[in-house]
Amino acid sequence: MIKKKNSPADKYLIKSQIGSGSYGNTFKVTHKESGQVFCKKSIQVNNQENIEKVLEEGKILTVMDHVNVVKLNDSFFENGNYVIIMEFAENGDLFQKIENQKRSGKPFSDFEIMHYFCQLVIALNYIHSQNIIHRDIKPKNIVLSSSDSGSGSGSGSGSSNDSIPLLKIADFGVSKLMSETDLYANTTAGTPQYVSYEICNKKPYTNKTDIWSLGVVLYELMTLSLPFDGRKETVMRNIQTESTIFKPVNHPNEELSSLLFKLLNKNPESRFSTQQILEQVFIREFIENHMVDFYKRFNFSIDGIFKVISKKLNLAGLNLTKEEKDNLEHKFIFTKMQEMKDRMKAFDTNHINKNQQQQSPQKLENNNNNNNDNNNNNNNNNNNNNNNNNNNNNNNNNNNNNNNNNNNNNNDKNNNINNNVNYNVLKKVSVELGFNLDNYCYDTDGMLIELVRSKLEGKDRKTYSKCYNYLSNKQSAFTNTNNEY
């Protein structure tokens, strides 16, 4: 008997739940061996839409390497969910920071506003250089790390780097990875109070939509209020129709106040890019005078920040550096998930309802085109065809009974899996690979098979030759119903 290997999830101890959403939950966890604290994000992947989101977020986090962006530490499958382990920000988020300032009745100092804003510009400049649109920039998605690599955060009321936390942009769940030739997106995404004019009007948009959101965050830092607030419908209508998008900001920093008009400009073409923001003299002077040493505390250099950052990402197919290849073993999961998405698209066109007990169009076509061959098939192969066509003989009846028993045994947990895949054979494959298929629930055959594929990834071909032979190609993986394994 093959001993079941420990799950990657066993390495982490859940301390508390941080949040929840329509696609999954987030937890504060501790690595059992090192004691290091992480953020665990568990995402459901039980349909193709969720797979698309996980695939996109996975690609993005894999290539992200910036001190102002949350880092990916690990990723794996757990009970039908895809799990991302990220660094944990111990000081909450910018939303909580703003709320604390409101309660205290004290506005942020000019130094704090400039420092926070410049950190966000530097972070967005990097993100946009990777052809990524975040699409949900807001205080809740900006987390606060310590004010020093080895110390806690200060009170946040002074004019020194010692009191300034390191900001990190988080949550790439609705982010978009653009190609170098297609720079426009058109999917509605974001939070109403921070969403751009073009998205409100359902127009195609570029990464300039993030600049609008950045402008809203800057407005909030300067005034402790939002340029638009209220119910979703009211906010969207105001952004769509108002000629003056926000009230003048009564703030001593006139340069920042003027910059707001370049960020919250309804015309994306006239809206500043991150590079244009960095080119502003007062921004550049602040960064050079106050932020170089700040970043050195985190072993990060911003030399060359005023130049266009070269793209690390080859969008024709993620071109990872040697270090990334060595350190990010989980990158194979994203390749596998891309294959999963493609297979599911092909498979779902022939997907049939189990209760209908009908043969798929693909099989009917195969039967018509290969009738003579089918007549000569062995009894095991005939079994599945006869099952669908209700033509039974003694041998086929025995095999049909076996298949019916397998379906009944797994009906509770996998009631959406149809007869195109022999569940019993996949279960034997899973046992040989050291996990229990009954612990997983999937809506389609393609997803069930891809679970087995993911477990087989990297295994020795000689040792697991039967598994590889069974899952050798898409056709056999989706249509093989032979009981012999």
Swiss-Prot record:
Keyword Aminoacyl-tRNA synthetase belongs to the record: no
Residues the record marks as active site: 136
Residues that bind ATP: 18-26, 41
Chain intervals for the UniProt region annotation (Disordered): 354-419
EC number(s) per entry: 2.7.11.1
Cysteines joined through disulfide linkages: none
Keyword set includes Transferase: yes
Source taxon at top rank: Eukaryota
Gene Ontology MF: a single term: protein serine kinase activity
Gene3D superfamilies for the chain: Phosphorylase Kinase, domain 1, Transferase(Phosphotransferase) domain 1
Residues of the Protein kinase domain: 12-283
Biased composition (Low complexity): 366-419
Record's catalysed reaction(s): L-seryl-[protein] + ATP = O-phospho-L-seryl-[protein] + ADP + H(+); L-threonyl-[protein] + ATP = O-phospho-L-threonyl-[protein] + ADP + H(+)
Pfam families for the chain: Pkinase
Entry's Gene Ontology BP terms: DNA damage response
One GO cellular component term noted in the UniProt record for this chain: cytoplasm
Start-end of Polar residues biased regions: 354-365
Keywords: ATP-binding, Kinase, Nucleotide-binding, Serine/threonine-protein kinase, Transferase
Protein family (similarity comment): Belongs to the protein kinase superfamily. NEK Ser/Thr protein kinase family. NIMA subfamily.
Name this protein carries in UniProt: Probable serine/threonine-protein kinase nek1
Organism: Dictyostelium discoideum
Gene: nek1
